[in-house]
Amino acid sequence: MKTLFEKLKLENQKEILILNEPDGFAEQLAELVDIEIYQSLIQVNKMEFALVFVSNIKELENQIHTLHPKLKDDVVLWVAHPRKKSEKLQTDITNAYDWHPLIKHRYEPVKVLKINPDWEAVRFRRAEYL
């Protein structure tokens, strides 16, 4: 069975950015060896891989404003949010959400991945790399 980070295409990365990591993911992060993990935008210049956890649309809007300048053009960008079916977490992000904060920066959703019963992630790529 593939690990979370194999599913997220964490291949050949030497450094990654993980923002707003919720409880329950520290063990999976600890499994990553020989990879520098940054958990603050202050620590980074331009990243090739980012996994950002947000709970609602407002958090996403605020985070993308500061995150976008820190991403390389062909970044592997995943935005994780609570699943609508989660029994523990609430969110206003649904399948009908238009992802406007990302689309205005020319990021398009390309894949959806169930992380666990409470979280799912959407991968985005810049339109010019599709």
Map each language-model feature to its residues.
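C-terminal substrate-binding/active-site "lid" region of AdoMet-derived donor-dependent transferases
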Residues: 80-120
